[in-house]
Amino acid sequence: EAPPKEPSPNQPKLDRLVAILKEQIGGDAVEDAYINEMDRHTPTVVVNRERWHDAAVLLRDHPELKLHYLRSLSGVDYETHMEVVYHLFNLQNKQTYCFKVRTDREQAEVPSVADVWPAANWNEREAWDLLGIRFTGHPNLKRIMLPDDWVGHPLRKDYVPVDPEV
């Protein structure tokens, strides 16, 4: 029998983060929370899509969190649903957190956080362009890589290219 696994050194940070989100945003703000051991024990939280923008403002402005730096934003097509993944970083204590927002695949829509972290602007446009995830409230949601007349979103798993050479 394997010995019990020791808790992650980041578990207290995750617990505090979840408590802050639930206290400040609401009990329904957090859909799931776990330590991603494969990613250097990164505290990871799945945030309710309807609460995401409010949560983003809190994450940036809360004096304990100070997540001022958006390290990355990417979209993922899981076939059953779409997900937007955000890696946020506290520049003072060098702590990284991961946040995920799930959305329906057929009407993929997530609130924009370009007003919270300006770096999200182009990343949201890229996720729109390639995966078709619409970011509501984005100041300029249009294609960023593909021509304006491109049909579809080529990184979706159900994408069928019009031209077989593509």
Regions found by a protein language model. Name each.
Residues 1-166:
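Terminal low-complexity/charged segments
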